[in-house]
A protein has these predicted regions:
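Short, charged/small-residue-rich alpha-helical element at the C-terminal edge
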Residues: 224-303
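A short, local hydrophobic-aromatic micro-motif
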Residues: 7, 20, 56, 245, ...
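Alpha-helix N-cap/helix-start and coil->helix boundary motif
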Residues: 10, 68, 91, 191, ...
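ABC transporter nucleotide-binding domain
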Residues: 172-258
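ABC transporter nucleotide-binding domains
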Residues: 4, 11-205, 211
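ABC-family P-loop ATPase nucleotide-binding domain
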Residues: 1-10, 300-303
Length: 303
């Protein structure tokens, strides 16, 4: 079941088409990676979903209904350009933002207390935002995004400004929110986070959707029949099932070679031949990373 769908969305500016007939479907309770280089159109799509701007063609639907002002309460949005009121105290700021999202005074107080404790910020509740470090301010902005327990979280580069410890803390919170029922749309050009977090992804480049699907299916579709084998012995002879692309000596008598399967050859065929030639220590298929795929597509490779 898809919680959010964008159908044939186009957005034009005077001299530039920011989105060109983009369609995506985001499964309920997934972590969905909206990927693309800077300027690809990701933020434009996010702004349309948040009803900050309108699309020129196409439509967005949430929970099967055409996008409507009532859906704003279903969304928590953490923009890349963070914005907190510097002179306001942390607790007051969170209370103000919670009430904008429709929480009662009592419920807001309870949730603010819970989240400040959870992220280790209780003692900062009475301090002004300008007194916080960048990482602390990021945490406060994250709390403001999730306070009203929205069904859809849109996080635009959520890890910028975090050290590795706090980035992991936020990752854990994202997983927990997903497990409790939230759908997370995660917009980024940092591919290592995508590998760790996302179930499904869509790649936007130059205003168009280039590919989408589950992370596993996309990675499998970009496999190119390459294998890495660690072994003792020699692979100098000609082979019926594979070509040796390159070889390095790992230690003493242990070597590692990159193999390219010949057309139509299966892993079992290659492994059987290897076992007859050498003492195999490990044999692994090369699966491209999301980063490899991203670079390949954006720089004009396979699409």
């Amino acid at each position: 079941v898809n919680i959010l769908e964008a159908n044939n969305v186009t957005k034009n500016y005077a001299a530039h088409k920011a989105l060109d007939d983009v369609s995506i479907a985001i499964p309920k309770q997934s972590i969905f990676g909206l990927l693309g280089p800077n300027g690809a159109g990701k933020t434009t799509l996010i702004r349309i979903i948040n009803q900050i701007i309108m699309c020129d063609e196409g439509e967005i639907s949430i929970k099967g209904e055409k996008l409507h002002p009532k859906h704003i309460k279903d969304i928590g949005y953490l923009p890349e350009e963070r914005g907190l009121y510097k002179k306001m105290k942390v607790g007051e700021q969170l209370m103000y933002l919670a009430q904008l999202k429709g929480l009662s005074n009592a419920e807001a107080r309870k949730r603010i207390k819970h989240w400040l404790e959870k992220l280790g910020l209780t003692e900062w509740s009475g301090k002004k935002v300008e007194d916080l470090s960048k990482g602390m301010a990021q945490k406060i902005q994250f709390i403001a995004t999730v306070l009203h327990e929205p069904d859809i979280l849109i996080l635009d580069e959520p890890f910028s400004g975090f050290d590795p410890v706090n980035a992991n803390l936020i990752k854990d919170e994202i997983f927990e929110l997903r497990d409790k029922g939230a759908t997370v749309i995660f917009s980024t050009h940092r591919m290592e986070s995508v590998e760790q977090l996302c179930d499904d992804i869509a790649l936007i480049n130059k205003s168009q959707k280039i590919l989408d699907g589950t992370k596993r299916d996309i990675k499998n579709s970009f496999k190119s029949g390459k294998y890495v084998v660690n072994y003792k012995g020699s692979l100098n002879g000609l082979s019926t099932n594979f070509d040796v692309l390159d070889t390095t000596v790992v230690q003493d008598d242990l070597s590692e070679s990159m193999l390219q399967a010949k057309a139509g050859q299966l892993p079992n065929d290659i492994l059987k031949e290897l076992i007859n030639l050498i003492e195999v220590h490990s044999f692994v298929e090369v699966v491209p990373s999301i980063n490899d795929i991203f670079i390949d597509i954006v720089e004009g490779g396979k699409s």
